[in-house]
Amino acid sequence: MSSSELIAELERERDRRVLSIQSHVVHGYAGNKCSVFPLQLHGFEVDFINSVQFSNHAGNIEYLTLPTRYEHVKGQKLTEKELEELYEGLTLNNINNYTHVLTGYCGNVTFLQKIADVVKDLKKKNGNTTFVCDPVMGDNGRYYTPKELMPVYRDLIIPLADVLTPNAFELGELTGSPIETEEDCLRAVNELHAKGVKTVVVTSGVTGAQTNESLRCYASVKGSHVYRFTFPRLVGQFVGTGDTFTSLLVVWLDELNGDVSEAVKRVLASMQCLIRKTSSYAQLQVDTNSRAMCELRLIQSRKDLLWPPTCDQIQVEKIGQ
């Protein structure tokens, strides 16, 4: 990318505004702290509501000999009444005008139910509003949110969603069957299409389709094509990668007019660079007992987030109509 191309991209005006309802951390990266910056970098205006505000994230990592979690987490959780009041203020001032709604971590049932009300109202006001939902519930066979969220996602949220980005565990919970193979995955994706979701991206976790060297994700557009993406498995698991992935997906689906194959490929290219940079930085640190050194190197990866590099290691295959 030349300097002139970079400047032109940074100066480009985009008539896009996202309402992002996710978690927030003061230190480090998770939820809105991961999602807002990539969107703004690409010229999207972002209004964000923090479902929770914590001192730091509470997630697990797997890297080097580091402690898997921060020892302490402090903060507050937004209630459904407080969400209602915030949205009421936007509505009364007639500033609830959004091209996209993005949702991620939600800590309780009534808050998620209120999100459904907000999305319904926004879609009633503007039928072209795109709702992108990451149905955050758990991973690797276990929940890290209340299980009671699942039926709310299944019955209230999914029928409203235009784009859904579950991992394999979440996909299985939403459709009632475990996802172990590619065939399981594609069957479950079709069930989500039948419920009205136009685009489904299964971000990770289809164990039968993975190897020690590579991972896979899948993307499907209702009534169109299904794609398989194979890419290198990098060392380490870092908190916030899913939130970053989904925000970049918002960008590239919009930029490429819904071309999910190219959009996901660009997202994966940026994510590979981000994870490599995070991993390299962590290995160079002297204090190997510091949990904080494995926070995503999001700011330092801004060029790769803005302009995904060509990555020959990402293989894209069309596997269905």
UniProtKB/Swiss-Prot annotation:
<dbReference type="GO" id="GO:0005524">
    <property type="term" value="F:ATP binding"/>
</dbReference>
<dbReference type="InterPro" id="IPR029056">
    <property type="entry name" value="Ribokinase-like"/>
</dbReference>
<feature type="binding site">
    <location>
        <position position="243"/>
    </location>
    <ligand>
        <name>substrate</name>
    </ligand>
</feature>
<dbReference type="InterPro" id="IPR004625">
    <property type="entry name" value="PyrdxlKinase"/>
</dbReference>
<keyword id="KW-0862">Zinc</keyword>
<dbReference type="GO" id="GO:0005829">
    <property type="term" value="C:cytosol"/>
</dbReference>
<keyword id="KW-0808">Transferase</keyword>
<keyword id="KW-0547">Nucleotide-binding</keyword>
<feature type="binding site">
    <location>
        <position position="144"/>
    </location>
    <ligand>
        <name>substrate</name>
    </ligand>
</feature>
<dbReference type="InterPro" id="IPR011611">
    <property type="entry name" value="PfkB_dom"/>
</dbReference>
<feature type="binding site">
    <location>
        <begin position="203"/>
        <end position="204"/>
    </location>
    <ligand>
        <name>ATP</name>
    </ligand>
</feature>
<comment type="similarity">
    <text>Belongs to the pyridoxine kinase family.</text>
</comment>
<comment type="function">
    <text>Required for synthesis of pyridoxal-5-phosphate from vitamin B6.</text>
</comment>
<keyword id="KW-0479">Metal-binding</keyword>
<dbReference type="GO" id="GO:0009443">
    <property type="term" value="P:pyridoxal 5'-phosphate salvage"/>
</dbReference>
<dbReference type="GO" id="GO:0046872">
    <property type="term" value="F:metal ion binding"/>
</dbReference>
<dbReference type="GO" id="GO:0008478">
    <property type="term" value="F:pyridoxal kinase activity"/>
</dbReference>
<feature type="binding site">
    <location>
        <position position="23"/>
    </location>
    <ligand>
        <name>substrate</name>
    </ligand>
</feature>
<keyword id="KW-0418">Kinase</keyword>
<dbReference type="Pfam" id="PF00294">
    <property type="entry name" value="PfkB"/>
</dbReference>
<feature type="binding site">
    <location>
        <begin position="230"/>
        <end position="242"/>
    </location>
    <ligand>
        <name>ATP</name>
    </ligand>
</feature>
<protein>
    <recommendedName>
        <fullName>Putative pyridoxal kinase</fullName>
        <ecNumber>2.7.1.35</ecNumber>
    </recommendedName>
</protein>
<keyword id="KW-0067">ATP-binding</keyword>
